[in-house]
Amino acid sequence: MKFTIIGKALVVSAAAASLAVGMTACGNDNTSGTASSSGSASAECGGKNALTAEGSTAQQNAIAEFNKAWGQACAGKNLSYNGTGSGAGRQQFIAKQVDFAGSDSALAKEQIEKAAERCGGNPAWNLPLVFGPVAMAYHLEGVSKLVVNADVLAKIFQGEIKKWNDPAIAALNAGTALPDTDIKPVYRSDSSGTTDNFQKYLAAAAPESWKKGAGSEFQGGAGEGAQKSAGVVQAVQATPGAIGYVEKSPAAAAGLPFAQIDNGSGAVELTDDNAKKAIAAAKFAKDGNDLALDLKSLYSTKEQGAYPLVLATYEIVCSKGYDADTAAAVKSFLKVAANQGQANLSKAGYIPLPDAFKARLLQSVDAIA
C-alpha cells in the first residue's frame, strides 16, 4: 500500500521546551483519563505525567511542538527530550534510560535483538512521525533557478563534476546562463542522519554514479566539511559556487535558494505538496505495526511532481513491555502528536502528516500494550 507520509525530521529540545503531540483519541482499556477540550481532537490523557526521550536533533523542533500540544491537551503532561543525536538516542532506549528514542534511521539489524530485550522480550517498533524535506541550497550569482538530478549531485559530491557550466548541468538548465565557476560542495563533517539519508538518496536514485554507500559519515571525498546544519548554511552563504544539503528550515531562514530536483519526470520545486507526493509513493519495509520505511521506494520515485529528498525520523517504542502508566503516557503523547501537534509543523519547516498515513500510524500506536 502507498501512504502519504510527511513530517519534518528535526531536533527536539529538553524539558525546557514543552513538547506536545497531537493525537487522536483511541479507545484502549489501559489508557484512562479525561479528554481535554483544547485541540482539534479529544485526547486520552492517562498514564504518568512525565516522559523521557532522546535522540535525533532533526526532529527536535517538531517534538517541541508536540510537547506543547500535549501539555495543552492533557494538563500536567510533559516530555523531556534530549537532542543528542540518533545513535545516542537508540543506545539510551536500549539501556532503558529513556521511554522512547527519536531516530533518523530505523533500528539497525544488530540492534533489533537488544531492543527486544529492553522491551521484555517484545519487538520494538519504528514509528515514522516526523518528516522534513532536505534542500540543496546553493550560492551562484545571477542564477535564480537551478535544476539538478541525482546523477549530477552524485558526481558533484565525488568531485567528478567541477564547473557549474558542465554539460551535464547545462542539459538540465536549458536557457540558463551558467557561469564558468568552480563548484564548492559543502557536506556535514559531523556524524549526521541528514548525511545518511542524502547518501541513501544518491545510492537509490543514481546507483550507477554513487557507489560510496551511505552512513552518517560523508563518503564522497570532495568538498568542504561543516559542523551541523548551521555550519552548512554559513558555509554556503559565504562561498560563491557552493552547494550543500541541509534541512529546509535553516536554509529558508537564511534566505538561500534551493535547487529543483529532476526525478526523471521533470524538474520539481521543493514545496510541502511536492514532498508529500514522494512520500505517497513510498512503501513500508514489511507488513505489521513496525512501520520502518522502504527508503528506496521513496528516494527513487519517478512520480511526476514528487520532490524525493525527504528525511524521515522515527519514534522507537516498545510494542509491549512498558509498565501500564508508561504505555498509556507514550500512547497519549503519540496520539496528540499525530493530531493536535500537526497544527504548526509547516511553519517549523516540517510536513504535516497526510490523513491516510496518520490513520495507519495511529493503528500502530493503538496496538502498543
PLM feature spans:
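Bacterial Sec-type N-terminal signal peptides, specifically the leucine/valine-rich hydrophobic h-region
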Residues: 20-23
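N-terminal segment of the mature folded domain
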Residues: 33-170, 233-235, 249-254
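Ligand-binding pocket segment of bilobal, Venus flytrap-like solute-binding proteins
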Residues: 90, 191-284
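Sec-dependent N-terminal signal peptides
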Residues: 7-17
